[in-house]
């Protein structure tokens, strides 16, 4: 149940129980701050967060861990989706500017998911790994807004940060490094030089450093009683020199209802994805299938999903292959100006 957005005459404290009494388990949309209050009134009520947002992941999960009557929460959303355009946007605003709930053209997807529409984890998904104790430490880098502006994150959004240490043009200028961990303290190193150590907030499991950007290696280390534990590393890549193709499956059914999803990556000479490489690639296919779709995760890229020349976003794009119904092979060829192309073959079998 949401707060009564469309029925302002109703009040949560007086009216919510009238609805909750009909439920075996009470779902609260974004209303985590009422969990404990309502438990005092109805100690037998079992509660879960039926919709929660990434910015409130820590407070929601802390309550789950604290109280046995709160059994978990559902994330809005796990995966980006088409529609509710830009509900998860972040803008740089001048004083007095208002941040709209939705965004107009060319925004087309919601951009509020922990995972993008190509299936890649976004920074908030790595942050949630910390909340859920799936990893010990991670970090992301947040460029500062332009002079005279402030970053304004929509309620369903996330700060403008990336798991990248490629910030060409910001050499010598400050960037914000957000380190996420449940360790009591974290240390930050740049090119093997210790920049500092900070306590991690127990409220949101975050420690923030201001760092003057220099290319190289940025390393965050979880520490316990001065003893270093796990680390997270971001490295500056070289320029993109070739394409790498990765298929979710190399063998699929010779059936028009089956699909193969191929990730297109722009990599440097050391095989690392170049996270700031946004450029067009050319797709072609031979054999027993067609290119059913293509695209990237950018929420404002209006290129057709049927395009044979999609653009990469953060160094990646996707091509979707569909069999023609016959047993055989589908070979996808991908090229881009100034770099070595790549091919991948998917077998189609009768099974």
Predicted region positions:
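Conserved structural position at the C-terminal beta-strand
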Residues: 222, 266, 334-336
């Amino acid at each position: 149940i949401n707060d009564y957005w469309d029925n302002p005459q109703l009040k949560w404290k007086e009216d919510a129980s009238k609805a909750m009494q009909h439920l075996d388990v009470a779902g609260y949309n974004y209303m985590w701050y009422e969990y404990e209050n309502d438990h005092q009134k109805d100690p037998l009520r079992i509660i879960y967060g039926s919709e929660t947002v990434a910015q409130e992941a820590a407070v929601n999960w802390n309550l789950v861990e604290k109280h046995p009557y709160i059994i978990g929460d559902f994330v809005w959303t796990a995966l980006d989706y088409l529609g509710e355009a830009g509900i998860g946007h972040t803008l740089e605003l001048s004083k007095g500017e208002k941040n709209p709930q939705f965004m107009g053209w060319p925004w087309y997807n919601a951009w509020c998911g922990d995972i993008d529409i190509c299936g890649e984890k976004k920074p908030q998904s790595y942050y949630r790994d910390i909340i859920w104790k799936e990893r010990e430490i991670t970090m992301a880098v947040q460029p500062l807004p332009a002079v005279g502006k402030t970053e304004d994150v929509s309620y369903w959004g996330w700060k403008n940060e990336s798991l990248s240490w490629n910030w060409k043009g910001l050499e010598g200028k400050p960037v914000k490094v957000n380190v996420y961990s449940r360790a009591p303290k974290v240390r930050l190193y740049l090119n093997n030089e210790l920049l500092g150590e900070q306590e991690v907030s127990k409220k949101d499991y975050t420690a923030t450093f201001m760092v003057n950007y220099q290319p190289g290696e940025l390393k965050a280390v979880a520490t316990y009683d001065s003893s270093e534990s796990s680390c997270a590393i971001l490295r500056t890549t070289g320029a993109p020199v070739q394409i790498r193709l990765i298929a979710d499956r190399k063998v699929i059914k010779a059936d028009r209802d089956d699909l193969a999803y191929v990730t297109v990556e722009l990599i440097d000479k050391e095989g690392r994805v170049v996270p700031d490489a946004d450029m067009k690639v050319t797709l072609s296919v031979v054999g027993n299938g067609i290119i059913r779709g293509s695209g990237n995760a950018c929420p404002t890229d209006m290129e057709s999903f049927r395009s044979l020349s999609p653009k990469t976003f953060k160094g990646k794009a996707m091509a979707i292959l569909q069999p023609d119904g016959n047993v055989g092979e589908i070979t996808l060829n991908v090229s881009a100006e100034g770099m070595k192309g790549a091919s991948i073959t998917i077998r189609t079998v009768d099974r």
